[in-house]
Structure formats: structure tokens, C-alpha cells
UniProtKB/Swiss-Prot annotation:
Name of the featured protein: Uncharacterized protein YFR035W-A
Species the sequence originates in: Saccharomyces cerevisiae (strain ATCC 204508 / S288c)
Superkingdom: Eukaryota
MF terms (GO), sorted A to Z: mitochondrion autophagosome adaptor activity
Keywords from the named record: Membrane, Transmembrane, Transmembrane helix
GO biological process: mitophagy
């Protein structure tokens, strides 16, 4: 006889919704009040479009570019040290 077991809690990470339309509509519903006037709705739509389509990608790419510029010097230093360490190991293992 099969005994039903209690459902196990979902231990997986929730993946964020990356579909633009659903996220955009959710942002609009969050910003709009149900009894807003037409001019208020146009202003809110403009605000959401400017924020979600223009400003956030611009800000994200700016921060990523700054981070990559900051890491560039460190990565070139690590590459140089790795190359010299590799040369020393090769010379000790295979002397000419």
C-alpha cells in the first residue's frame, strides 16, 4: 500500500524572470495606481521605460567597465608572474 509522503520543500534557488515583457508589466503595475489619470499613466510609463530600458543597462555597463579597468592591471601582473614561475619550473624539470 502506498502511503503519501509530505511534500519536500523546494531547496533549489529561484531563478529570476529574465523575460522583459513580464518584468516590464510588473514594474508598471507596481508604479501605477488603479485610478490614475491618463497624464499620470503616460508619466509613469515614460519613467519605467527610461529607468528599465535606458538608465539601468547604462549604469550596469558603466560599473562593469570600471570593474574590468580596475582588474586589468592586476590580471597583467598575475599573467607575468605566472609566466616567470612556469619558466622556472620548466628549467628545473628539463635543464638544457
Amino acid at each position: 500500500m502506498n502511503v503519501p509522503t509530505a511534500p519536500t520543500p523546494n531547496k533549489h534557488l529561484n531563478i529570476p524572470d529574465l523575460r522583459f515583457e513580464k518584468v516590464f508589466k510588473k514594474a508598471l503595475h507596481r508604479e501605477l495606481a488603479p485610478s490614475s489619470s491618463l497624464s499620470r499613466k503616460a508619466g509613469v510609463i515614460t519613467k519605467v521605460v527610461v529607468r528599465d530600458v535606458l538608465l539601468m543597462p547604462l549604469l550596469q555597463s558603466f560599473v562593469l567597465s570600471l570593474a574590468l579597468m580596475g582588474v586589468k592591471e592586476w590580471l597583467s601582473y598575475i599573467r607575468l608572474k605566472g609566466r616567470t614561475l612556469g619558466d622556472r619550473i620548466r628549467q628545473r624539470l628539463f635543464p638544457i
